Regions:
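Ribokinase/PfkB-type carbohydrate-kinase core domain
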Residues: 2-14, 18-100
Length: 100
């Protein structure tokens, strides 16, 4: 099964995309992963630098579609805000229409 992961990529600690990718690949799944945000460290430390990657994520998904890359399951994790949430909802709705 190929799983598309959309979530934050954190520079410190094995959390979010780093953890999910590791666990799912260890269980034999193929993983396609794109960050919703790049975050310097876990948020529990009190402060973090963050880069919203919505534009990159959308361009990457368009590229993958042109290349014929497909997925069987979708995971959406960390969302940076309302604008990104709206786009991620569109992705989820399109996946649902395809039976995912």
């Amino acid at each position: 099964m190929t799983i598309l992961l959309l979530g934050d990529l954190t520079g410190r600690s094995r959390v979010a995309l780093r953890m999910l990718t590791y666990e799912l690949e260890a269980r034999g799944h193929e993983v396609l992963a794109l960050p919703t945000a790049l975050i310097s460290n876990t948020l529990n430390l009190g402060q973090a630098a963050m880069l919203d990657t919505t534009d990159y994520l959308m361009r990457s998904l368009e590229t993958w579609e042109k290349l014929g890359l497909t997925y069987d399951a979708l995971y959406i994790g960390f969302v940076t805000g309302v604008a990104q949430a709206e786009k991620l909802c569109e992705i989820a709705e399109a996946a649902k229409k395809r039976g995912i």
